[in-house]
Structure formats: structure tokens, C-alpha cells
């Protein structure tokens, strides 16, 4: 414990938190409290988060459970926006200005991995069978733009940030037999066994149909979330991601592009990115020296790009948590900066 205490104190001092040129920056009590919190973080037991491993006795290409293998396209339609190859599409005339607005020197950031602050890192999903019992959801924020029908929420559903998470608390549920996707934002199990959520959306994955114009979903842009996640099974087992990814920016434009149906911005300035905007990694960007999983992600960004889906941190790429990720390898994509990306030509912008 003494060693840990010394390491933490060194880190705090190195960050200029103890004193600077003789001027006390923090009281002893504040420093002690921060050290205690850091020691707890370092010494606490690793959180438990298990995903469904491949079941050789289940012949279905889509298996059951949390983080289960999905060995088929979520949207099978070749013309679906998520499946579109955008590697040859023209660059938008305003690309450089938009990239600069988001952050030309800001890195790509994998918003997924093993654990972060004691909780699974990423947006979790679970696959259920068609006979999974459905339960009503009490929508208390965006009920007028939610699909008000029962949702097949399993017992102890995985929630973004964990059971006590304070963030977006997304929960994604895929019905493999009816091929429908149920997504919830700010899901909160109640003491009586019922559920509350801010919003919810149901997507028939057999169709290209989007949300009604002007409607949100469990995501700000009105898009489904699961089709845009970096998943372990695709990256490490199938070794190829064949769809666009989801990403966030700090501030967006008061506009959206299909397949998005909703905006979450206030500015109408042309250098602010609209929801549904698509960017790709430059074709001449050399990915050969990156770890295998990072190469899979970067090649996906060159061919399919990523779609702006929510406000958040700059260039945060969304994915599903999995204890099998090697965080050091996925974090290699941080070497990619905003200036290495380009906005593809935007058409049919709506407000």
C-alpha cells in the first residue's frame, strides 16, 4: 500500500496539484481525499462482466447472450446506408472547415474496451430469442418520439456504464428470431421490477425504413446504435467490419442528413457538422504498422467511414465492451488525427 501511495503522490505532484512555486494548490485534506480515491480505484477487485462465448451446439449464426456472436449483417440490404461503400465518393467542399471545427489535431478515440472506472467500457448489447418475455417501458422524457410497445428486456439487462452508471445508460436488445432491434436510452430498472427510460426505438432490420422525420431514437440522430458499433466478434473473429461506425463530436449543426432523422444542435454555421454526416479515413493512410484489431477498424473507416450520431467528445468511436479486448491495441487508433479524415459530400440536408 505504501508503494501505491507513493506512486499516486508522485503523480499528483507531477500534475502540479500539490504546490507550484511555493503556492499551495490543494489543502492537505483535498490531496488526502484524492489519494484515497485513487488507491481505492487501483486496489478494488476487477469488476465482473461476462460475455457469451461461441456455442458450438448452437447452429444459428446469431447466438444468444450478452455480446454474443452476430455472424450475419444486421441490415442485409445492399443499399442500406450502413452498408454503403463510400471509399470513392467525392469529398465535401467544406470538409477542411468542418474537420477544423471538430478538431484537426484531436485523435480518434476508441470509446470501448474492457473496463473504465469500474464498469464495462462501451455500449452493451444482448441477443435474445423470439420468445423472450416483453415488458412495458415507462418513457419519461421523449415518450412522444418513442415506440410505445413492450420491449424484450431480459433479467438484469446490460446497461452502459453498469447498473449504477450516471451516463447515457443505453441498453440494446436484438431479437434474433424476429430480426428486430430494441434500443433504450437511460434505462432505469425500478424497485418493483418495472422499467423507466428516457426514450426507446424499435427497428425492423429486414427493412430500410428509418424513424419518422424529426424523431429521435435511443440516439440523438434518430439512428440505430448497434449497427454502428465496433464489436469483438467482427473485429477479432471475422476480422472484418462491413459497415459504417458511430461517432460523436462536441457540438453539431441544427440539421441532419439521411439516414439520420433528428438534429441535436443550435448553430446553423456551415462549419458545424450535421447529424448523419459521414467521414472516412484517407485512402493513402498507411495502416500496415498498426496492431491487427486496429487495422480492421481503420480499414473499415477507409471503406465505410463513420456516421455522426450524437454530441459528445471529438472523434469518439463507439463500440461494445468485452473483457477480451486488448485495450493497448485498440488504443493504437489514437495515432489517427482529425486531419487524417475527410467529410464525404453532403446531400439532402434537412432541418
Describe the function of each predicted region:
Residues 3-16:
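Hydrophobic membrane-insertion alpha-helices, especially the h-region
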Residues 1-3, 21:
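Short, low-complexity patches enriched in S/T/P/G
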Residues 39-351:
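Short, surface-exposed polybasic-aromatic patches that bind anionic ligands, especially phosphate groups
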Residues 17, 24-46:
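Composition-driven recognition of long, low-complexity, acid-poor segments enriched in small hydrophobic
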Amino acid at each position: 500500500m505504501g508503494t501505491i501511495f507513493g506512486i499516486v503522490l508522485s503523480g499528483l505532484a507531477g500534475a502540479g496539484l500539490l504546490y507550484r512555486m511555493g503556492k499551495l494548490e490543494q489543502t492537505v485534506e483535498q490531496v488526502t481525499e484524492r489519494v484515497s480515491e485513487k488507491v481505492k480505484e487501483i486496489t478494488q477487485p476487477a469488476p465482473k462482466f461476462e460475455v457469451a462465448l461461441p456455442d458450438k451446439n448452437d447452429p444459428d449464426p446469431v447466438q444468444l447472450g450478452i455480446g454474443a456472436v452476430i455472424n450475419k449483417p444486421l441490415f442485409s440490404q445492399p443499399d442500406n446506408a450502413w452498408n454503403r461503400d463510400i471509399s470513392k465518393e467525392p469529398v465535401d467542399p467544406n470538409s477542411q472547415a468542418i474537420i477544423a471545427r471538430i478538431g484537426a489535431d484531436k485523435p480518434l478515440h476508441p470509446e470501448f474496451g474492457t473496463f473504465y472506472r469500474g464498469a464495462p467500457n462501451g455500449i452493451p448489447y444482448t441477443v435474445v430469442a423470439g420468445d423472450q418475455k416483453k415488458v412495458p417501458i415507462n418513457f419519461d422524457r421523449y415518450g412522444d418520439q418513442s415506440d410505445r410497445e413492450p420491449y424484450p428486456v431480459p433479467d438484469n439487462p446490460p446497461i452502459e456504464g453498469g447498473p449504477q452508471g450516471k451516463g447515457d445508460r443505453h441498453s440494446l436488445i436484438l431479437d434474433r428470431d424476429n430480426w428486430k432491434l430494441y434500443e433504450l436510452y437511460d434505462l432505469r430498472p425500478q424497485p418493483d421490477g418495472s422499467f423507466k427510460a428516457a426514450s426507446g426505438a424499435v427497428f425492423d432490420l429486414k427493412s430500410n425504413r428509418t424513424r419518422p422525420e424529426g424523431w429521435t431514437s435511443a440516439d440523438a440522430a434518430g439512428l440505430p446504435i448497434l449497427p454502428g458499433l465496433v464489436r469483438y466478434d467482427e473485429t477479432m473473429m471475422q476480422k472484418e467490419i462491413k459497415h459504417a461506425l458511430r461517432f460523436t463530436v462536441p457540438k453539431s449543426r441544427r440539421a441532419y442528413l439521411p439516414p439520420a432523422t433528428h438534429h441535436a444542435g443550435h448553430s446553423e454555421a456551415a462549419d458545424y457538422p450535421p447529424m448523419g454526416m459521414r467521414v472516412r479515413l484517407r485512402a493513402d493512410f498507411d495502416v500496415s504498422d498498426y496492431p491487427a484489431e486496429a487495422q480492421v477498424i481503420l480499414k473499415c473507416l477507409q471503406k465505410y467511414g463513420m456516421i455522426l450520431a450524437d454530441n459528445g467528445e471529438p472523434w469518439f468511436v463507439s463500440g461494445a465492451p468485452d473483457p477480451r479486448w486488448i485495450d493497448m491495441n485498440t488504443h493504437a487508433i489514437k495515432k489517427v488525427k482529425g486531419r487524417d479524415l475527410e467529410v464525404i459530400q453532403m446531400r439532402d440536408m434537412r432541418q
